[in-house]
Each structure stands twice: as structure tokens, then as C-alpha cells.
Amino acid sequence: MTDTSLQSNTALENETTHFGFTTVAKEEKVTKVAEVFHSVAAKYDIMNDLMSGGIHRLWKRFTIDCSGARPGQRILDLGGGTGDLTAKFSRIVGDQGHVVLADINNSMLNVGRDKLRDNGIVGNVHYVQANAEELPFPDDYFDVITISFCLRNVTDKDKALRSMFRVLKPGGRLLVLEFSKPVLEPLSKVYDAYSFHLLPKMGELVANDAESYRYLAESIRMHPDQETLEGMMQDAGFENTKYYNLTGGIVALHRGYKF
């Protein structure tokens, strides 16, 4: 292979990424992911309960417990969607604290805003439409950042992690809650069957959208495994990194600090 061919292939790789199992231009992924979440926003909470049997609430509770959130702190719930974590953080930080619910998708953000306001959660929560790769916040601003079931949808994950590191205060912590790789082979086989066959059918029946939930299954398989993601966090500058496998590694919570 010539140097010119190598350069051409490298340039192509730099301009493309994965949307599920499909290779697409980076700009196209942003559009396609947006379409997925515009489509599922209204049924997002219902589908989360159905898909996980409600276990997602335990995963999120563990994330809150590991956050170390305290009254008066500033917290960023990035890719916070319908606001499950924001609701909990709002109560913890109190009137002197501040929670930002940020999401790139305005449909998800609107659903989250409406849900939280309907539940009387106002005053210390602000809503920002933002791209995780280019966060519109000052340096060293947040005490805690969480990103829950969102990172796998981000086009440039390394850039997003660097952006999170920038806006986190020294001494602050990042928590990444995301689908991961099952650690037990029998569980992995059952999980594959469930993900690729039952999830799209559930999506079709409940949300009238099988394709978005097929993408969900594919995006999980393309997401970095536990060790790889921990390494990416370290490359972005995070220290004292650690991850916890939840439900046999179907989900993992990664934690890292900025010092």
C-alpha cells in the first residue's frame, strides 16, 4: 500500500464513525442520533421501566450514592434526558445548590423540564441544550458531573471526556453510567437474544419504533468495554479511576476524579 493510500484511509477513518453497526460520516451520526431521541422522547421513561424491569432505578440510585453530592454544590447532569438524576440531585443540593440538566436533544430536554416542573422541582434546576463535546460552561465550575446512558451516543467520546474534565472543579468527580459488556458468558448469550429480538419488538409495540431500539442494541455492542473506557478517562486527565459492574456487567458505573 502506498503512502498516499494510507493517508487516504486515515483521513476517511477520521471523518467516519459508527451509528450502531453502520459506518457513517460523523455529521450524519449527529443527525441520526437526534432522530432516534426525537422519536422516543415521549415514551422514554415507560420504555426504560419495561426494558430493565425497573432495575435502572437501582443503577441510578447507586450512581447518586457514589456521587458524594452535598448541599450547596453545583452538579451537571449531562445527557440527563428526562431528569431522573436531576430530580434526586435537586433535593440533595438544596436551595443554595445548583443543578444543570443538559442534553443535546431538545425533545428529551422538554420532556425532562415538563416532568420535573410537574413534580414541583423548580428554583435550583436549569436546563441547557448542549453538546457534550463542547460544553458551554466555565473551567472548574462543577463539583460533580454525571453522564447516564448517553456517552455511547456521543460521536467523539474522547473530546467529550476532555470537555467534562475542563468544566469539573479540582477535587470533583465524574460518574459515567452506561451499558457495558457482561462478564459472564451465559449471561452474555441471553442478553444478546433479549437485545436483538425482544427490544425492537417492545419498541414497536410501545413506542411504535422498532428501529430506534435496534439501534440501542447495536450502540451498546459498539461502546468501549469497561477497561477501555477507564483508559479513555485516564487519557482525558481523570485520576483514581474505578468502575463497578452492575447486574453482571450489563451496566457499569465508572468514576474518576480531577486533581
Curated annotation (Swiss-Prot):
Residues that coordinate or bind S-adenosyl-L-methionine: T82, D103, N131, A132, S148
Reaction(s) catalysed (UniProt annotation): a 2-demethylmenaquinol + S-adenosyl-L-methionine = a menaquinol + S-adenosyl-L-homocysteine + H(+); a 2-methoxy-6-(all-trans-polyprenyl)benzene-1,4-diol + S-adenosyl-L-methionine = a 5-methoxy-2-methyl-3-(all-trans-polyprenyl)benzene-1,4-diol + S-adenosyl-L-homocysteine + H(+)
Family: Belongs to the class I-like SAM-binding methyltransferase superfamily. MenG/UbiE family.
Gene Ontology terms: biological process: aerobic respiration; menaquinone biosynthetic process; methylation
PANTHER family: 2-METHOXY-6-POLYPRENYL-1,4-BENZOQUINOL METHYLASE, MITOCHONDRIAL (PTHR43591:SF24), METHYLTRANSFERASE (PTHR43591)
Gene this chain is encoded by: ubiE
An example molecular function term from Gene Ontology annotations: demethylmenaquinone methyltransferase activity
Protein function: Methyltransferase required for the conversion of demethylmenaquinol (DMKH2) to menaquinol (MKH2) and the conversion of 2-polyprenyl-6-methoxy-1,4-benzoquinol (DDMQH2) to 2-polyprenyl-3-methyl-6-methoxy-1,4-benzoquinol (DMQH2).
Protein name in UniProt: Ubiquinone/menaquinone biosynthesis C-methyltransferase UbiE
Pathway the protein takes part in: Quinol/quinone metabolism; menaquinone biosynthesis; menaquinol from 1,4-dihydroxy-2-naphthoate: step 2/2; Cofactor biosynthesis; ubiquinone biosynthesis
Enzyme Commission number(s) from the entry: 2.1.1.163, 2.1.1.201
Lineage: Bacteria, Pseudomonadati, Pseudomonadota, Gammaproteobacteria, Vibrionales
Disulphide bridges, residue numbers: none
Recorded superkingdom: Bacteria
Keywords, alphabetical: Menaquinone biosynthesis, Methyltransferase, S-adenosyl-L-methionine, Transferase, Ubiquinone biosynthesis
One Pfam family named in its UniProt record: Ubie_methyltran
Transmembrane feature ranges: none
Top-tier EC class: transferase
